Each structure stands twice: as C-alpha cells, then as structure tokens.
UniProtKB/Swiss-Prot annotation:
Function: Component of the acetyl coenzyme A carboxylase (ACC) complex. First, biotin carboxylase catalyzes the carboxylation of biotin on its carrier protein (BCCP) and then the CO(2) group is transferred by the carboxyltransferase to acetyl-CoA to form malonyl-CoA.
Subunit structure: Acetyl-CoA carboxylase is a heterohexamer composed of biotin carboxyl carrier protein (AccB), biotin carboxylase (AccC) and two subunits each of ACCase subunit alpha (AccA) and ACCase subunit beta (AccD).
EC number of the protein: 2.1.3.15
Top-rank EC class of the record's enzyme: transferase
GO cellular component: acetyl-CoA carboxylase complex
Protein's name in the database: Acetyl-coenzyme A carboxylase carboxyl transferase subunit alpha
HAMAP family in UniProt: AcetylCoA_CT_alpha
Length: 312
C-alpha cells in the first residue's frame, strides 16, 4: 500500500479508481484511468514547491543508506567502532566493491520502523559516530581507497551526553580532516541534509544531491520557531532557506543533481539505486584520471570559494 502525501491526493483518487475498475473487470475504464493518472502525475510533479520536496525528502518509504549499500555493493564488509567510546549505529561504514572498484562507504542511517529508528537514533549521530567515520576514512586513505559518503540526517544528536563527549569538536575535526584527506571522495545527499550533522561527512571532491533531497543549515521548523516564534511558519521558512537541490546547484554549493524516478526515489527504489550507482561510477572514473595533488588542490579551492564573507 503506497503512502500518499497531502499534495498527492488527486493521484491517490485516480489510483483508487483504477483499483475499483480492475475489481469490476472493466478493462476499458482501466486504460482510460491510466492515461488520466499519467497526466495527473505530470501535472502535480511539474512544479513542486520547496515544501513539497521537503515532504518527499522525509517520506517514510524513501530508500535509506543501507538500501543503497545492499543494492550497489558486492562483497562488502561492515566496519564498527570509533576505538574511543563505542559503536554508533547512526553511522554505518563498509568496505566493498562497486563495478569492480574497491570503495569505502560512510553513511548516515535513519532506520525503518520503531525498533530500528530507536537503534539508529533516528539518523542523528553521536560524536562517536563521526569519530568512527573519521577512523574508517583514515583507513581508506592509508590504502588509497576512494570514499563514498551517503548523507541522510535531520542533524547531529543534541543530547547532553553527546555534548559532553564533544559533539561540536567531532564535527569540526571531520571538517578539518576531510578537507585534506588524501584519497578521492564523493558525497551524496539521499534524503535530509541537516546542518552540521550533514556537513560532518559532506566535505568531498564531488557533492551531489538526489533531486528531491534537501540540504539546510537548520530544519524549517527550527527556523520558523526562531524567526517567527511560530513552527506553523515552516512552509515559509522552507522557501526562504533555499534547501532544494536545484537552488543549491544554482548557488554553486553542490556539484550535481541526480534525477530521481517519477514521484520520488521511494516509488522505484531499483531505478533510484541505479541512478546513484551510475553517478558514483562516472565520478570515480573522472577522479581516477586526475593526480592526487590536483584533486587536493581543487578540493581546497572549492572549499575556499564556498559562501560569501567580508574581511573586517
């Protein structure tokens, strides 16, 4: 049973009509309704608002990092622990192969269903998760293995324990280390890219977003609560924040947009995985042809050209 979003009500109605026509055995009605459905889908998805893309990015059926790992990697092996405090299940790390290319995957995992959402802390990493990511990245650097980051988090965990164990230091350390790690890196936002929680594994040679994913300095709800003292203003905040892939590409804050299947990645997970896999292979092939010194120079140049600042 498909989970329909609020703006998909007209699509749901036609889908329901098709199901009823099939039960009646009315083949001619089914064919007509299928054509109407195609038109309605094109109409609804032609000009999605920022808030609608936010809803798609948070869709409960959207493929998570482990879905992409299982679909794309062969002979993969999970790597656990930060060797300092504990293993954080919100960050998952793998050594494996994609199209016969050896890679390391470092990813944020939200978890599906109550049990696994709690296990993965809803995709909000603790500092030990980011330290695990750095430990595994350093291992990849040692053996000259490219790193693929999958970003999907509402943000780093803001709990007391996380702060006591140095959440801000862990994020800052990753920003520092990943800006100069001596191996090719590719980061892909597959759902939510929430603030520092996303940036902590988001410094890379190539940064891409799925077309219905979002990347923001703060959640729209948090922004609305701060600016307007009203969480109900989240739709206006979504528009003001410029969080969509297209907007961030126009601002030169990301490198590429990976097109999702019609109606979102959750509607065709195999097609979504194929698109992500093709992107990874294409960019790995590009980076393999560039000397490491040049990769590092371009990465540093890219970081220094990000954003706007004034020197006082």
């Amino acid at each position: 049973m498909a989970n329909y979003l609020d703006f998909e009500k007209s699509i749901k109605q036609i889908d329901d009509d098709i199901s009823s026509a099939k039960i009646r055995g009315d083949d001619s009605a089914v064919e007509i309704l299928k054509k109407n459905l195609e038109k309605e889908i094109n109409k609804v998805y032609k000009n999605l608002s920022e808030f609608q893309r936010l809803q798609l990015a948070r869709h409960p059926d959207r493929p998570y990092s482990l879905d992409y790992v299982r679909a794309l990697l062969k002979n993969y092996y999970e790597i656990h622990g930060d060797r300092v405090f504990r293993d954080d299940p919100s960050i998952v790390c793998f050594l494996g192969y994609i199209a016969d290319k050896k890679i390391v995957v470092i990813a944020e995992q939200k978890g599906r269903g109550t049990k696994y959402k709690l296990k993965r802390n809803f995709g909000m990493p603790h500092p030990e998760g980011y330290r695990k990511a750095l430990r595994v990245a350093k291992l990849a650097e040692k053996f000259s293995i490219p790193i693929i980051f999958f970003i999907d988090t509402p943000g780093a965990y803001p709990g007391i324990g996380a702060e006591e164990r140095g959440q801000s230091e862990a994020i800052a350390r990753n920003l520092f280390e990943f800006s100069d790690i001596k191996t090719p890196t590719i980061a892909i936002v597959i759902g939510e890219g929430g603030s520092g929680g996303a940036l902590a594994i988001g410094v890379a040679d190539k940064l891409a977003m799925l077309s219905n994913s979002i990347f923001s300095v703060i959640s729209p709800e948090g922004c609305a609560a701060i600016l307007w003292k009203d969480p109900d203003k989240s739709e206006a905040a979504t528009k003001a924040l410029k969080i969509t892939a297209e907007e961030l590409k126009e601002l030169n804050l990301i490198d590429d947009v990976i097109k999702e299947p019609k109606m979102g990645a959750h509607r065709d997970k195999d097609a979504a995985a194929k698109a992500v896999g093709n992107y990874i292979i294409e960019k790995l092939n590009e980076l393999e042809k560039i000397p490491l010194d040049e990769i590092l120079r371009k990465r540093k140049e890219k970081i220094l050209n990000t954003g706007v600042f004034e020197e006082l």
